Amino acid sequence: MKDPGLVAVGVAAAVAFGTALALGLPPIQRDKPRRKSWEVSAAFPTPVIAAGATVLVIRVIGYHPPIPLAIVGAVVGALSAAFTAYIEKVFPRPEAG
């Protein structure tokens, strides 16, 4: 049987990727080389933030749901995609210099 927490993390990552695309984030970073790019995209860091936030909700907080964990993962994924899309408004980039 599949671990419901792992399924929730996968659902969160998939929903976060889709929501980020719907919010207008590019699918991958445009800057090259991509490994040195800090541009936010749907591929990175959006699913990573969603997976981490889902694990925090399930494991660290100890959420024992009346709601299935896959739905919790979907909600956390959508919220983390919205956070990632507007992260530079919350935490502005520092001035170069």
Curated annotation (Swiss-Prot):
This protein's name: Probable [NiFe]-hydrogenase-type-3 Eha complex membrane subunit A
GO CC terms: plasma membrane
InterPro entries reported in the protein's UniProt record: Prd_NiFe_hyd_3_EhaA
Keywords linked to the UniProt accession: Cell membrane, Membrane, Transmembrane, Transmembrane helix
Species assigned in the record: Methanopyrus kandleri (strain AV19 / DSM 6324 / JCM 9639 / NBRC 100938)
Similarity-based family: Belongs to the EhaA family.
Cellular localisation: Cell membrane
Membrane topology of the entry: Multi-pass membrane protein
Signal peptide from the UniProt entry: none
Subunit structure: Putative multisubunit membrane-bound [NiFe]-hydrogenase eha is composed of at least 20 subunits.
